[in-house]
C-alpha cells in the first residue's frame, strides 16, 4: 500500500483511512461489499460484478451527482500509484522487486478526497468521484492475447467522463509503446458500437487526459502534446468509419488535455507538487483548465449508470470486431463482395431503363398509378437480394448479412434517383390540384378553416402517394415532403394575399362610392367649408371601411390567418391607396373642363334666373350690365376654392403619403410578401424629373388656371353680347301705334272678310285647326311640312321656267310639243265635259 499524500480535500463523510480490511486489486475473486476499499467490477475472466451499485451506495459520502474517471496505459507504468496519490484511493500497487502484474480486470473505488494545493476555503464540488483502475496493456501474463485489453480499454472509454492515459515521456512518439495501435482498434469499434448515439447527443464528449510520467523538462510539454495530437488525428483519419458517422471528426468525440509529472523516486517532492497541481484541475471550477465539463457527463443517475455500464460490457464482450479477423471471415468478405458486385451490376443495367420509363411517365398526360410503381420497385429490389442470397448465404452469417445490408443500401441509393423523378412529378401535380382548390370560391366555414382542411387533406394524400413508392420507407422521402409542405404554405400564403387584396379592393370601392357622392354634393355649391367637408367625409369613410376588422386592442385582424406584420402592411397599403383614390377623384371632378362647366353653371344660375328660380327677361342694358357683373362675381367665387384644396382655416390639405411618388406607388400597388417587397425595394427605380411636380393641394397649374379664366371670360362675354342684342332688337321693333293705324285704315277690308260667309267660315276653320295643332304641339311639325311643300313648289316652278327659256331650237320645239300635248288633253277633257 502506498501512503496517501497530503493535503487532500476529503468529501463529506468518513476519513480516507476507514477501518476496512484492504482487498488487493490483484485478487481475482469477488468478495463481500462491506469489507472492500475497492470493488472489482470486471474480473480477469470477463465476468461483470452486479454488486457495483451496493458498493457505491455504501461508500458514497453523500447522495448526489457523480463523476467517472478511469486510467489506461501499459502494465507497470504506475497507474494505480497515480490514482492513489491523486484521489486518495487504496488500489494495490506493484511489487517493485518482482515487477509482476498487480491489477487484474477492472477495479473501482470511491475517492475519499482529491490531492490539491487550493486554499482551505476553496470551493469543492459536492460530486462523488468514482475511479476505475484498468488492467495494464502489453503484460507478459497475457502475452499475445490482446482481446481483454482491447475490451477493457473500450469499456473505460465508453463509460468514463475522463480517461487518463498514463505513459512515460520516453513512450511519446512510439506506436506500440504509446498504445496507439490499441487506441486505433478501440476508436474504430467505439464508432461502430456507439457512434450512432453521437448523432442524437451532439454535445457529449470524452476527455482524454494524457499524463506524461518522469518528465525531465528538456522537451516542453507543448511539443509532447503536439506529437500525441498528431498521432491521434492520423489514427482517426485512417479509421474504417461507418457511413452514417463518416462525416464526424475527432473533435466531435474527444477533447484532449495534457499534464506532466516529475520522477516519483528521484524528484519525489516535485512529483507530489505535480500531482496536487493535477488535483486542482479537478476541483477549481473557476479555472480555465477545470476538467469536469458539463458535456462529459452521461446525464443519467448512478443507478442508470451501473445498468448502462453492464449493457456496454455485454455489447463489447460479444462484439467480434475486437478480435483479429480470421481467414474464414476474410474469405466470406471477399466472396460476398464479389456476389454483391455481380448482382448490382445486373441491377444497374435495368435501373437505367427504369429511369427512362419514369421520365416518359411523368411527361405523359395520363395519371400515374403510384401503387403499381411502388410494387415494381419492391419486386426489383427483392429479385436482386434473392440473387445475392442464393450466392452468398452459405458464407459467414454476420459477413453475409452485413454485405446484404450494404447491397440493399446501394440499391436504395440507385432507386432514389428514379424515386426522385416520380416524387418531383407528384409534388407538381399535387400543388396544381391544391391551386385549383384554392381558386374555387365555394368554401364552407371561414377562410382559415377551409385552408387548414385543404392543407391537411392534400398533405395526407401526398404522403400516402409518396409512401407507396418509397420501398416501405427505405427511400428518403423527407426532402420532398419538406419541399411540398413549403410550396403548400407558399400557395396558401399567396391565396391569403389574394383574399387580403380582395378585402382592400372592396373597402376602396366603398370609399370611392361614398367620396364620389360627397364630391357631387360639395361641387354643386362650393364654399369655404367644401374641403373641410370632403376631408371629414374621407376620414370617416376610411375608418368605417375596415371597422369590422378592428380588434379590441386597436389592431386589425382580417380573419385570414395572416401574420400581424402582414396585417400592418395591408393597413398601410389601404392607407396609401385611399389617399391615392382621393387624389384621383379630385382630379376627376376638378379638371379644366369640369371647372369651366362649374363656373358657367354658377354664372347661368345667377344670370338667367332670379332668387326664386324664375327666368329673367332684361328690359334695358343697364339692368343687364348690373346682373352680368354680379353673376360673374358669383361664379368666380368658386375659382380659388376649386383650384387649391385649402381648409377653412387657410391650411392646405396635406396627404399622409406622397401619392405621386413612383416608388411608393409601386411599393403600395398591392399587398405582397415581405420578401417580394424587400426585393423590389432593392431594385433600381426609373425616376423622372419631378422638380416641376405640383403639390397635392394645387389642383390646377397656373397655365391651366389662365386657360380656364380666358375661356370663361370669352364665353360669358359672348352671352352678354347675345343678350344685349336681343334687347336692342326688342327696342328697335315696329311701334305699337302702327298696328292701330293699320286697323283703322284697313277696317273696311276686315269687315268685308267678316261679312262674307265663305271667308268667315274659312277663317273659323283655319283658327280652329291652328288651335288644335297648338294644343297638340303640332305647330312645329306643321310648319316644317308647309316649309317643305313651299320648297318643293318653288323648285318645280324653277325647273319649268328653266325648260321654257332654254335657247335651243330642238329643245324648244320639244318643250312646245309637250305644252301642245297638254293643251290637247285639256281640250279633249273640255269637249267631253261639254
Swiss-Prot record:
Compartments it resides in: Endoplasmic reticulum membrane
Membrane-traversing stretches: 734-754, 758-778
Positions with biased composition (Acidic residues): 676-689
GB1/RHD3-type G domain ranges (all copies): 63-296
Keywords recorded for this protein, A-Z: Coiled coil, Endoplasmic reticulum, GTP-binding, Hydrolase, Membrane, Nucleotide-binding, Transmembrane, Transmembrane helix
Residue runs in coiled coils: 659-688
Region spans: Disordered: 1-26, 670-689
GO annotation (BP), single: endoplasmic reticulum inheritance
GO cellular component terms given for this protein: cortical endoplasmic reticulum; endoplasmic reticulum membrane
InterPro entries: G_GB1_RHD3_dom (IPR030386), P-loop_NTPase (IPR027417), RHD3/Sey1 (IPR008803), Sey1/RHD3-like_3HB (IPR046758)
CDD domains linked to this entry: GBP (cd01851)
Cytoplasmic membrane side: 1-733, 779-834
A Gene Ontology molecular function term of the record: GTPase activity
EC number(s) given by UniProt: 3.6.5.-
Binding positions for GTP per the UniProt entry: 73-80
Membrane topology: Multi-pass membrane protein
Pfam families to which the protein is assigned, alphabetical: RHD3_GTPase, Sey1_3HB
Membrane-side (Lumenal) residue stretches: 755-757
Biological function: Cooperates with the reticulon proteins and tubule-shaping DP1 family proteins to generate and maintain the structure of the tubular endoplasmic reticulum network. Has GTPase activity, which is required for its function in ER organization.
Family: Belongs to the TRAFAC class dynamin-like GTPase superfamily. GB1/RHD3 GTPase family. RHD3 subfamily.
Record-given protein name: Protein SEY1
Organism: Clavispora lusitaniae (strain ATCC 42720)
High-level lineage: Eukaryota, Fungi, Dikarya, Ascomycota, Saccharomycotina
